[in-house]
């Protein structure tokens, strides 16, 4: 469950019968699943990927999934007509509520993303604030082509400097070096 919303219901009076609406109610709080930057959506945590996403469509799909799950769990308990107010349905007005929530009601609350290299074999958690993962692992291996290229292009001393700089980036020390 996303920590910045709760699924709510309300009853609307119709001419002939009551309609139960299921909708997302956005909570004003410092969220660990949602980031707001510059007065707008910045990123959302996607648990299945183990990464943050800066694509707002991912946020809308996660909210819609929560709505659908709630409906599926509770559908036997409702009497009358049930209407789920999905984010994808512009006529429901929920997308406008979402934009109002992100742009007007919430204050900036974010961490910079992708300040650390994440390799394919890296364990990632939410606090790594990563939205991208490299497609290859960081592990020892043969680098014959790299060695040949570097020894052709650079002297041993220059190569050492370049590899030192690359190493400082990979280990994260480059942020502390002046």
What annotation goes with each model-predicted range?
Residues 1-4, 46-74:
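Short, small/acidic-rich helices and loops at N termini and domain boundaries
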Residues 40, 75-76:
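Positively charged interface segments
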Residues 1-14:
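N-terminal non-globular leader segments, chiefly Sec-dependent signal peptides
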Residues 34-57, 110-178:
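P-loop NTPase catalytic core of nucleic-acid-dependent motor ATPases
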Residues 14-33, 155-161:
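Phosphate-interacting basic helix/loop segments used at nucleotide- and nucleic-acid interfaces
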Residues 82-132:
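Structured, non-catalytic alpha/beta "coupling" segments that mediate domain-domain communication
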């Amino acid at each position: 469950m996303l920590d910045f919303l709760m699924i709510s219901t309300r009853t609307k009076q119709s001419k002939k019968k009551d309609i139960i609406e299921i909708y997302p109610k956005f909570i004003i709080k410092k969220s660990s699943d949602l980031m707001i930057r510059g007065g707008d959506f910045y990123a959302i945590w996607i648990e299945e990927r183990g990464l943050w996403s800066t694509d707002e469509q991912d946020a809308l799909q996660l909210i819609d999934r929560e709505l659908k799950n709630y409906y599926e769990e509770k559908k036997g308990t409702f009497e009358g007509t049930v209407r789920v107010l999905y984010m994808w349905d512009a006529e429901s007005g929920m997308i406008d509520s979402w934009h109002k929530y992100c742009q007007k009601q919430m204050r900036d609350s974010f961490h910079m993303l992708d300040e650390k290299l994440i390799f394919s074999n890296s364990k990632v958690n939410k606090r790594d604030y990563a939205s991208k993962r490299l497609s290859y692992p960081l592990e020892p291996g043969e680098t014959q082509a790299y060695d040949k290229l570097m020894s052709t292009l650079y002297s041993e001393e220059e190569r050492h400097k370049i590899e030192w700089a690359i190493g400082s980036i990979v280990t994260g020390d480059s942020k502390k070096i002046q």
